[in-house]
């Protein structure tokens, strides 16, 4: 492995956490749009899998804190998750904001000249599956992009699976 110097680092120094910090509902397209309106070019988002293996944006293993749904994210197919309101918990201005897939976010990021730190946030027991699925989705979405997304995780197992699935994508272990 070669050393990366600051001059080699392709990412901005400032990253908008979960899209726009507390200014919009976290991990939504509204958050990314809000962050971009303040001039941010890079966003950190959390990615996990639905019950049917779709990579989506969500921090928590359960739905209650940031949606009008109940239960575990990985117990629901994405079609059911897509119907949930992920904006009203923040404010009425964001009512009806949905849970986006990683693919949809990738298209927005690339169309808006932005960059992404994808934190792989696996539901316990799905570390390898989540790491591999997120990496493969990222590889496909960014195949022609100049700057790939940064894959990060607190899970060494998820990052190992991401490395095996898409070794060309940069990774970072969070501590």
Segments the model singles out, each with a brief description of its role:
Residues 1-175:
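Phosphate-group recognition and catalysis centered on beta-loop-alpha active-site segments
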């Amino acid at each position: 492995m070669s050393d990366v110097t600051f001059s080699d680092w392709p990412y901005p120094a400032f990253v908008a956490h979960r899209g726009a910090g507390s200014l919009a509902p976290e991990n939504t397209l509204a958050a990314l749009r809000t962050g971009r309106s303040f001039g941010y070019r890079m966003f950190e988002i959390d990615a996990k899998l639905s019950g049917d293996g779709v990579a989506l944006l969500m921090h928590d293993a359960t739905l209650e804190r940031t949606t009008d749904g109940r239960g575990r994210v990985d117990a629901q197919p994405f079609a059911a998750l897509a119907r949930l309101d992920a904006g009203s918990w923040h404010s009425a201005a964001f009512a009806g904001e949905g849970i986006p897939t990683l693919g949809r976010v990738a298209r927005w990021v690339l169309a808006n000249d932005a960059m992404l730190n994808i934190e792989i946030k696996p539901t316990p027991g799905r570390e390898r599956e989540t790491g591999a699925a997120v990496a493969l989705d990222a590889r496909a979405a960014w195949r022609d992009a100049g700057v790939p997304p940064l894959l990060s995780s607190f899970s060494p197992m998820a990052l190992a699976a991401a490395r095996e699935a898409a070794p060309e994508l940069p990774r970072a272990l969070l501590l």
